[in-house]
């Protein structure tokens, strides 16, 4: 089993094409240490069609053993380096690390705008710029497209929390507190007071989680009836295996991301004191005993200000999402559809559902098909 730190991490990384060059992007702030400089990858084919694709990468844990690196792994599907396919069609491609890992949407927007300016200054002015993002990076891509329609001609969000980070925080927080109710012996701390060093015990937690869930199938079924987190229900065997996989993925974020999330927003952005949880049986005991968390209003405002999509599209956006996504639930797509409709901008949104269980479980053909749809719509765009 592979935990998804960022999407598309399941294949070996091939050598970079000769058209691609890696380099640091210098910053003007002398307080920024050299190892935290933004790393950039720029690929320009000989037959450049004057269109540029920028990629916003997915979640990388904020712990120091995860350095600021280029997202080469997540750009490889079916042993194919996706930018190489774009280069063959004449597109230039660029991506970068950010100045921090973890909860980075606000930082990522600034860094990718800097990347665009750097490309324009060092390579030339493209005629069209397209933004693509995977998982957490898809949220960044949408916000860039919404906020800077004068700079981006179209966008593609893959398996992304398109409905906004507040909904994603609610999903992750609810799963954690309900998990703790059914399996109280795994964690000795609450959902949002995760110790900074808790990640060092992750391997121990994994062993405990697997044992608890496989030895108490009834409690596992209850957990998923309450949280509605995605599993593959095709058989009892696949239910158990995917239930464990989903739990490990979501609890990974709880342990590895929560301290940085709280620090970045200046408090707890999650509230469940008045939430009613409903499952198969014994809902009264569940609601009496489940951990109740009080949010910090400033942290909630921060999440809404910097991590919430608005739906105010002025350029075409295509989304690609697994129907049974265990990490970023598909209902994000329904939320965003409502936001876009509320802005009367539905003509700019194309959502493509992909059957099956998994996070960012796409084939090369599916990603290229969605990319082609985005290009076709953007090139045919004639203005509001």
What do the PLM-derived regions correspond to, one by one?
Residues 161-308:
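Accessory cap/linker subdomain of secreted extracellular hydrolases
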Residues 318-321, 325:
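Short beta-strand/loop motif that positions the catalytic acidic residue
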Residues 326-332:
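Conserved alpha/beta-hydrolase "acid-adjacent" motif
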Residues 138-149:
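Short glycine-enriched nucleophile-adjacent loop
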Residues 348-363, 375:
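Histidine-bearing beta->alpha loop at or near hydrolase active sites
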Residues 12-52, 285-294:
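N-terminal cap/lid segment of alpha/beta-hydrolase-fold proteins
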Residues 50-61:
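Short beta-strand element of the alpha/beta-hydrolase
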Residues 47-48, 115-135, 151:
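Gly/Ser-rich "nucleophile elbow"/oxyanion-hole loop immediately N-terminal to the catalytic nucleophile
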